[in-house]
């Protein structure tokens, strides 16, 4: 799920709305991942509260934030490595890296109106994480950023 998982202004109970949004994947027992959108906090939960709820749901691969990043802006910044097919030469190897970054909600800079953006702490985490992965797997695997 790629952000704006609920419509905050109509969500009188954000947790209930999130449960409904992810119910099809949960019922089908499909592993899934989510990242926050700029409106997810407009209901009854804060941005952190929304992500805390998401990471407790069944079959989610979502993470609150990377454990090694003690100071990082936003909630739900993480990466997932997709491994190759069992029985292939790529089994147990990272063939695709998915990066999930919280771009925030609204600008906190008065001179810049509109929506938020990826912050330097997140850029640094991305650079460090992708560099470690490149060294570990000793080649450039593909990556996608959400």
What are these model-derived regions, one by one?
Residues 1-16, 20:
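N-terminal active-site segment of His-dependent metallophosphoesterases
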Residues 1-6, 37, 141-146:
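Active-site beta-strand/loop signature of hydrolases that rely on acidic residues for catalysis
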